[in-house]
Amino acid sequence: MQTEWWKDAVVYQIYPRSFQDSNGDGIGDLRGIIQRLDYIRSLGATVIWLCPIYASPLIDNGYDISDYYAIHPELGTMEDFDCLLRQAHQRGLRVIMDLVVNHTSDQHRWFQEGTSGQNPAYRDYYIWETEKPNRWGSWFGGSAWEYNTQVGAHYLHIFAKKQPDLNWQNPALRDEIYRMMSW
């Protein structure tokens, strides 16, 4: 009987910005990770776990994603990511990524268009209340509810104020997230 790969995996987690700088700008990047794949494999790792590399304003170390379909430019390009995948697989390494689907950045297109009225359907991708419904606190301090003047309501943010929580009760949001996950 063959066990699932993840049961016996040796996982090496990488925070890309501090791992290996390939171009001398002081910020680790995808090319830097590629340069160290042989080293990672020599440690016995079978899986690389990447912390967020998506486009982000970096309020919360990349966990405030503004575009699930783009790489943060300081970390590289989509071509660099494709190269990382190819090179890792050639060495027998799997690559997994942080899946941040509790919230987005307030700079994400969904939040921007939903709050500006440009695409009102996106407003319901987030959790809104006209009045603060409770006294929940944010992990980052203060209230977990932030008032948005454009909408005239409070949105939930369990983390930073610039990380509005997603409304998983909305089937359209779930479809968007599932589409991104299978991309």
Predicted regions and their residues:
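Acidic/aromatic-lined carbohydrate-recognition and catalytic surfaces
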Residues: M1-Y178, S182
